[in-house]
Amino acid sequence: MDNVIEMPSGHSGALMWVADPGDAHVNGSVDQEADRAYRKLPGIAPPTGGHVFRILQLAPGKSAFMHRTDTIDYAIVQQGACVMKLDGDEEVAMNAGDVMVQRGTWHGWENRGDEPCRLAFILISSEAPEKHLHMED
């Protein structure tokens, strides 16, 4: 692939598809100009109201970069193993074939193994989560 980006963290990634709001149709062709413009933007979230599909390869031994996006995310571990770190001390171990759906949580991905871990992500733009996701009575 010619669109792989090496990140300062040592990880690498590739943007496979991006769509603006209302672009969920199969007729026509990809707007190459809009696609090139999006690839130059910083950040990982899709355009507001849109969606994005990307591949991420986690390098071994790198710490998690904690972040949150206003998205619903589908993550599929394609190769290797990793840990998804959440707020506090919570962690979820994931292996090849595992699928995770998350909704606007603070999280980070960490590869504690000796081999790269490859994940596929689909991020769908969403409203920001409420400040307090866990309400007490």
Predicted regions and their residues:
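Short beta-strand His + acidic residue motifs that chelate non-heme Fe in jelly-roll/DSBH
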Residues: A64-M66, M84-K85, H107-G113
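Glycine- and acidic-residue-biased ligand/ion/polar-headgroup-sensing regions
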Residues: D70-D87
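A short hydrophobic beta-strand segment most commonly corresponding to one strand
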Residues: D73-Y74, V99-T105, D114-K131
